């Protein structure tokens, strides 16, 4: 990226997020990561490295109890709530998802392209989450996709890359609503089933339901069964399979339709759910 384009991007980031809405990493190479910095937060999908956070992926991983593998020595620039995003040796941005064998995903060819993508995402998220206007939400989704391709024509070449996963997550509720149900036991042993239906917006039905129950004073140990219409996800910004397994280790989990770990499996799960809904409606 040229110096002029760097300056234009820096001005756009400051104009949109404000100085306090950006976090710089002074040890980073020259560019947006050092000045003016990346957004502190963009919806559920990105949160910049905190001022007191470990700077290497390996340090962060060790503190969290997992092995970062080949990414251990790299500069950690933020998180999506489950994957750690980092500055790679070839100056690209990548994301590592912890697990038995860490999954390493392409994100962007450089920090500038990533910052432009985050700027687009933050501008368009409110419209994409406009549950009362599905036409507006779909138009904003398409604008985001085209904008990302304009920034990086190869953004969607790898369907398992980070940006394709973000867009899959945004598209899911635009295609079809899905639901979740928790069975909750009270202090007297009485049971009740509580449900939530998802739709356009930034929270999955599991997240909405747990937020609601926590606000009512329900504790995690009271959740004994979890049913999700779509298999709990491992998608950027959510990682429902992971947080629910952590929150409800005692619960029995079932789901109606596989969602899986690949783009193909996710697409097949959505199609199966849509077909089931159409059949029920006659």
Task: List PLM regions with ranges.
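Zinc-dependent deaminase catalytic domain
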Residues: 122-282
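Short acidic-glycine loop/turn motifs at beta-strand connectors
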Residues: 81, 87-91, 184-191
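Structured loops at beta-to-helix junctions and adjacent beta-edge loops in soluble globular domains
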Residues: 78-80, 96-98, 185
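A short, sequence-level motif marking secondary-structure junctions
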Residues: 90-92, 112, 197-203
